[in-house]
Each structure stands twice: as C-alpha cells, then as structure tokens.
Regions:
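N-terminal and secondary-structure boundary signal
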Residues: 1-118
C-alpha cells in the first residue's frame, strides 16, 4: 500500500524543512514503518547535472539534509547517497558538490555510492 503525506513548507530554511519532513514521515507511521535500523539505505537526490539549488533541477540540499538528519537522529547508520547524472560531463561527485548535496552529505557523514565508476 502506498503512503503519501502532503505537508506545506514555504521556505528552504533548514529547520522549517526538517519540521515538515519529520511531520510528513510521522503522519505515515514514522521512519521505522519503511526501513529497519540495520538496513542499508541509499538516498537518491536526483543529481541530474551540476546545477545550483536555485535552478530547481536537483533535490534541494535542505530537503536532503532534513532526510539525512531524520535518519541519523533515529539511529540509522548504513546510509549512502548516489545517482547517475544525465550529463556526460557531470560525475556524481561534481554534481553533488555543485548543487549543495555534497556539503549536506558530509555534514551527516553520508558517503557517495559512486556506481558510475564501477
């Protein structure tokens, strides 16, 4: 059964985004309804290109940070992130750095799972 929660958030302020994400997850039964603490988690932030957050091409770093923070605060440890950029000149690492996801991932100790180079 699919679960959806719509929670308004009119700002990319990190605390406001975190509160909205946390509210949405709680409305759906909490994070433990979706993943167990010992499972591996891959966050896929839509790293299409090396675009700044203002261009709204990739997931905003405040949203990525909110999900990462929620997982860390709930005790999840096996978390990585990754994607396959649509541009042949954009590596996942370059795209993550350009759009702010790399900094957010580093803040929460989340490693890049680079399957492009494998």
């Amino acid at each position: 059964m699919a679960r959806v929660a719509l929670v308004p958030c009119n700002s990319y302020d990190e605390e406001k985004v975190f509160a909205a994400v946390q509210t949405g997850v709680n409305l759906m039964g909490g994070i433990s309804a979706f993943v167990k603490p010992d499972e591996k988690i891959l966050l896929k932030p839509n790293l299409l290109s090396k675009a700044l957050p203002q261009r709204a091409i990739t997931t905003h770093p405040a949203v990525f940070s909110a999900v990462a923070r929620l997982l860390r605060e709930e005790g999840y440890t096996h978390i990585s992130y990754g994607d396959s950029p649509g541009s042949p000149t954009a590596t996942p690492q370059k795209a993550a750095e350009s759009c702010g996801i790399g900094e957010a991932a580093q803040k929460y100790g989340i490693a890049l799972a680079d399957w492009m180079g494998a």
